[in-house]
Amino acid sequence: MAKVLVVTSGKGGVGKTTTTAAMGAALAQAGEKVVVVDFDVGLRNLDLVMGAERRVVFDLINVVHGVAKLPQALIRDKRLENLWLLPASQTKDKDALTEEGVGRVIAELRKSFDWVICDSPAGIERGAMLAMRYADEAIIVTNPEVSSVRDSDRIIGMLDSKTVRAETGERVEKHILITRYDAGRAARGEMLSIDDVLEILATPLLGIVPESQDVLRASNVGCPVTLNSPASAPARAYHDAMRRLLGEAVEMQIPSERKGLMNLLLGRRAA
Amino acid sequence: MSVLRLFTGRAASAPVARERLQILLAHERSLRGQPDLLMQLREEILAVVSRHVLLDPDKVIVRMDRGKHVSTLEVDIELPNGADRAFASAG
């Protein structure tokens, strides 16, 4: 049974595209057949983070409009043979997507993949609505910060009311993924704690991804962080999250960077 | 933690964030799924007042301020001079 997973957040810049790429690659490495779909029409970035920006010929809009067939638009990852990308269009605006057209593409993707991961645009407008419309499961990417938590709450409300599942009396299975977490600042009371965020959002936790330079380094070179530096703290966090998504019971922990003794003593963040 | 705060001289801000979010989200959730309350109030106030005086619908401003303990509803209706008399003589 194929699963449609939306990666969403409401707020921009919290790590949706990073998460889509990292989770997609992790699932593909675990043997699942995965397609990552960029819904950010007009501001596509998933191709860049995946390192496939020079291989884009056709895109989601072309397929929705029947200009290209789905296999023509799908780009196979060069590193993982189980991983595919369906890019967004760079030029057209968000109205180019129709609910019915997206439904057709998702239905077709369900036939050939185990996981269809939809990378949502920021906001709560049409693009974000369409990205979540056909989802079975959702990852709500949240930073431990007031505006991100508020927007996540809003998105949770939409997942519970505006999706096909919600309208047919079923539930979208929701997971919170906390990203850019800084354990030191949380311990000093400078950042909302994991418990604070979970209590406020009342949604189960999928994983905690620490703030790390490895994420930027991976996007610089166009490689999902789970592939680029598998031993890094964020990659391990995404890997654990992937296993939980597959139904494994993995103990929740916050992977940390190795800190030098001086850094620990001075309470500095590891570089 | 309090020892740490003695050294840094700063109060932890996370509890403030948490409390603000809890108050705000409780409120926003209660409004979810309902039609926009302010728009509805504005429409109905406009209907009632314009039954008695002539007014310009664009000059009706309805604003709500939410405080911690009480909220206020501010209705600002601008009436053109002589509007009520004009209306009375017309009716």
Swiss-Prot record, chain B:
InterPro entries: MinE (IPR005527), MinE_sf (IPR036707). GO terms for biological process: cell division; regulation of division septum assembly. The keyword Cell division applies. Keywords: Cell cycle, Cell division. The keyword tRNA processing does not apply. Prevents the cell division inhibition by proteins MinC and MinD at internal division sites while permitting inhibition at polar sites. This ensures cell division at the proper site by restricting the formation of a division septum at the midpoint of the long axis of the cell. Belongs to the MinE family. This is Cell division topological specificity factor.
